[in-house]
Amino acid sequence: MKDLLNLLKNQNYAHEFDSIRISLASPDMIRSWSFGEVKKPETINYRTFKPERDGLFCAKIFGPIKDYECLCGKYKRLKHRGVICEKCGVEVAPANVRRERMGHIELASPVAHIWFLKSLPSRIGLLLDMTLRDIERVLYFESFIVIDPGMTTLEKGQLLSDEQYYEALEEFGDEFDARMGAEAIQGLLADLELEDEIERLREEIPNTNSETKIKKLSKRLKLMEAFAESGNHPEWMILTVLPVLPPDLRPLVPLDGGRFATSDLNDLYRRVINRNNRLKRLLELNAPDIIVRNEKRMLQESVDALLDNGRRGRAITGSNKRPLKSLADMIKGKQGRFRQNLLGKRVDYSGRSVIVVGPTLRLHQCGLPKKMALELFKPFIFSKLEHRGLATTIKAAKKMVEREEAVVWDILDEVIREHPVMLNRAPTLHRLGIQAFEPVLIEGKAIQLHPLVCTAYNADFDGDQMAVHVPLTLEAQLEARALMMSTNNILSPANGDPIIVPSQDVVLGLYFMTRERINAKGEGMVFSDIKEVQRAYGAKKVDLQAKVKVRIRDVVIDEDRNKTVTVSVLDTTVGRALLFDIFPEGLAFSLVNQNMTKKAISRLINACYRRVGLKETVIFADQIMYTGFYYATLSGASIGVNDFVIPDEKAKIIDAAENEVKEIESQFASGLLTQGEKYNKVIDIWSRANDKVSKAMMDRLGKEKVVNKDGKEVDQDSFNSVYIMADSGARGSAAQIRQLAGMRGLMAKPDGSIIETPITANFREGLNVLQYFISTHGARKGLADTALKTANSGYLTRRLVDVAQDLVVTDLDCGTSEGLLVTPHIEGGDVVVPLGDRVLGRVTASDVYSASDNQNVVVPAGTLLDETTVETLEKAGVDEILVRSPITCETKYGVCASCYGRDLARGHLVNVGEAIGVIAAQSIGEPGTQLTMRTFHIGGAASRASAVDNIQVKHGGTVRLHNLKHIERKNGNLVVVSRSSALAIADEAGREREWYKLPYGVELSVKQGQQVAAGEIVAKWDPHTHPIITEVGGKAIFVGVEEGITVKTQTDEITGLSNIEVMDPKDRPASGKDIRPMLQLLDANGKEMKFPGTDTPVQYFLPPNSLFSLKNGDTIEVGDVIARIPQESSKTRDITGGLPRVADLFEARKPKEPSILAEISGIVSFGKETKGKKRLVITPTDNTDPFEILIPKWRQLNVFEGESVEKGEVISDGPSNPHDILRLLGVGELAKYIINEIQDVYRLQGVVINDKHIEVIVRQMIRKVDVLSSGDTTLIKGDQVELVKLLEENEKAGEEAKMPARYERVLLGITKASLATESFISAASFQETTRVLTEAAVTGKQDHLRGLKENVVVGRLIPAGTGSAYHQERRRKRMQKEGGVSAADVVQALSAELNK
């Protein structure tokens, strides 16, 4: 008997495997899988319900219908296992073999597999070098193809129409062989000599010049090599045997009423079998050619429909006009095998219910309804009942549970003790959407949730539902407790800030108790300690908000856990003293001695976590919550209509605005303004008015007059409930209060344009019908937007997860010294993100020196920068640091811990095995729903603000000039003549506090290192013209300047001054078309001047449309403006904002009219112009080849003739193209660009995301390289391969002293990068399943199952987290097997034996 059971176990024993390979199945292979041929289209006998013999459900082929019982019933029971019944031919076996046994159909005529024919690029077409059109004409019997020309003038592979074929027959007889249909194609494929073809192509590629041809040839070469290497035969793409899916995977289910529900596949198979059998008969009968041909074509079409319905021609539909679901449809799409069943499975031991608030719970608890718990923990209860001897069998235990006997509840209590359950709320946008809690049994049917975890779940109690899952095994319980317990997830993985932060009522309560109220009961009392305050408050001798003096005992704990106690009498309020009583030891009183707004509480919890650790913080968070709820109740804050105080100034402000608008309307009427200008001005006026009203309103709400104890009237912060709620951050914002008590303001039309007339009323006054109608627009658009946004944001997250899913921390340190240079993010005069925030939790890549002393190492390389180190850096005035980054990490698969730095959710160096890719994707995708969907139109205010014409310093400090090329004027001022210069102001410590770009032609009134005071103007320029500036002085001579031919004189009507304008070549008379007007400088002797240190004569070309007022022979000083090019005020461009912008950046889309960058460094000159384009030539200084580029005439250039540019400098402005940045400026600059652009979008919405998440995604976007030349490696020129693979090849080549391959990094968008991953399982489960699988099969791809997705699909532990240990162990064992035992191991084993 024991053997039997072992046998049973062995039947479904899964082999351990390390990789999966898919390839084409040969006909013999298909036959070897099969258990018999399906010959009839019948399914089951409708009377007996037994499967028909040789039909699609035949028991003889596929196995018995009942367990261990043959069809006729002769053999039953286990003892006959393996017997084949002589009567019905059925093997006695378990019924589940019907899920795995396949059959086959022998096709009477070969049929092309549609995937290899129609999935682009067509593999069959590539191999035969024919167009898809031609192949289809052969396959679907429209024309003949020559297979063997014999001794005729025909060529192999030539197509012949019917007439041509019969003509050829008459001419040559049966000397040649031409056929049609799949057998013809099969013959051609079988005749291919792959090796010879590959040789021929390899020789041909270097000898062709046309790019397109090389591309085509290398595509063919790649495919041929793939076939040759993988052992696939090309003719296997044509099917001669068709496999039949096991019947239980395409079931036939009897419905009540004698009808059957069937899988579509059965219909499709029936079609194939019917046509196949008919074709066989026709062939036996030697039917006329035309009938056989038609039948063959129909067979081809039916097989096409079975494999991929609708790919060619019209989809075959069922009885209800619905296209039938083919084999391809089964695996692709959201409802396909991959996404429905392999990546998302339903799980047992789970339940869901509505959530309600559980204000009395501790942070690690959740309330679980008894009924649910009983159902979820059933198996545990059964086993306990049996174990205790309370029930004899499982069945008895089941009965007890169903009767809900008293003892069952006691046992449930025991079972549940310390058995965590997982709570999940959909949508799970980040990993905090599933957390573990200890259940507390409650009455009722709703799950109780702790209020503090609502932020993480994004849950509210308006009817949200949550799901409960039970971790069953000990390991699962352990992981749930150690990794997923809500108490272990206090910090957000996106930015490292606490996510367990009180909100709403709790904030309101804490804010209320920490406010001061003037002249409250007990003001001015002095207390010896907090206990005394409590007694006084309890005895009602003192109010909660009274100002008092209290003696406070402050404890400070330093790094080494040493305590320092300071005792001092401080001014505070009763509420603050009471709140300080629940603080853990080690937190300063200053943290609470303020109005506790939401921000202050967040800072408090952060400080608590950093100073006193996790355990104390969790207890503290709970205490804070209970306290907050208690005092919120006491405060009695509620709002009524009268709390919305309308400011008295409102009417005045609105009147003034209306008068301004009238003024502008009259200007418009008299033609002084265009429609657009009027619109912008009006909208500006109303936005300003709205701001004024809301400021007046907040001032009015925020202050109230009270009498102090001296009897004087003073202002104090108001206790108006509305103001309290907004100011504390509990609920509502100034913008919302503005609509309630100020004015509603401007509204947008559905198309996004703003309506000129604002709604001047607010909700308290009430809207009239017109105002209400206008406001409905906005409200509806808001709802429509939200729905769209959710879908788009979810899709972005999905693409991000897919591109980064296989990035895991695999190593402690890769040892690289590369990194990214991080600087503070400064916009104009404001530090938006200080350096400390950007480098916190990163590892330094090189020694950091202090700003004042270049020898003094502040922080050595390889240090993890924590809060204290960052403070040291701030003090030392460091303003740029090279930190390690995932982008520059050199680990082969994955990233090393040092390059990643701190695990934001845990606050220490990241653990090996952390799935940083998925975390990064979630952190970027989760706030996606908060981003806007709209494109901003720059109107009014913004377009005028852009015309800045000077730089005014905000802070005093030292001037630093970066990348400056300048010349000095006579008056000592510097004039900037480079384009990428910048001016920064550094403070005493040497940190840069302000940073400004300097345009060309700016006049600076300061020098490098000069001290300036706040408010000083350091630079001026004319924003409306672009100057041309001389770099040497001399006498001006004009060349090619002829009035009416190349230039025309303009006289300004108002000032009477005259200007000479250079005419556009297209407006010049024919004689002046090719003349290029220029200005030459001569020295005092009348000789040509040269630029200092060169042989280049000093010539300034005057571009078209430039204006100048010099005369021939004028003397020119250094730094004079010789001509000005008027700048058209830049047209208002729409700025794509929000979610679409983030998607564009991650998809690496090229912008419409990107900025043009210099490809090489050198001197600029202009060549011959073509129609509509300028030819710009850059000549390098080191005599290499010059570089030419054609630029459309309308593009404004930033460079002049003779100017020198650096590689990657902007020649013509526009939105940056990330591909250019990578190519010309390298990975570092690209990373910086993408990080800053994405952070700008998120920062606008107030979302904080750590840079490293974006870096992780960027790493995945640049992991491919283009091979520029193959050297002596096996790579093909023009191929795209993984960087890792290329570096491995080059390493090999280096060891053998061969030529390495040259390459160029490429940037792929996230969708492309996901599909270009090494793992075909991951790619197929993402998008374009058919294409991915076709390619993988043809090339015989092997999937090494390195990523997370692949392992989920094959049902293994993922190689991340606790699963990474399992995978490492397996890898180690495999190495040992392959490499045998090493000598060291033997020695170790021996010594171990001897030491026993």
From Swiss-Prot:
Catalyzed reactions: RNA(n) + a ribonucleoside 5'-triphosphate = RNA(n+1) + diphosphate
One BP term from GO: DNA-templated transcription
Record: residues binding Zn(2+) 2: C814, C889, C896, C899
Cofactor: Mg(2+); Zn(2+)
Note accompanying the cofactor annotation: Binds 1 Mg(2+) ion per subunit. Binds 2 Zn(2+) ions per subunit.
Keywords for the protein's UniProt record, in alphabetical order: DNA-directed RNA polymerase, Magnesium, Metal-binding, Nucleotidyltransferase, Transcription, Transferase, Zinc
CDD domains per record: RNAP_beta'_C (cd02655), RNAP_beta'_N (cd01609)
Protein residues bound to Zn(2+) 1: C70, C72, C85, C88
The keyword Nucleotidyltransferase is assigned to this record: yes
Keyword Lipid metabolism: no
One CC-aspect GO term: DNA-directed RNA polymerase complex
Residues that hold Mg(2+) according to the record: D460, D462, D464
Entry EC no(s): 2.7.7.6
Similarity-based family: Belongs to the RNA polymerase beta' chain family.
Protein name: DNA-directed RNA polymerase subunit beta'
Natural source organism: Hahella chejuensis (strain KCTC 2396)
Origin organism lineage: Bacteria, Pseudomonadati, Pseudomonadota, Gammaproteobacteria, Oceanospirillales
This protein's encoding gene: rpoC
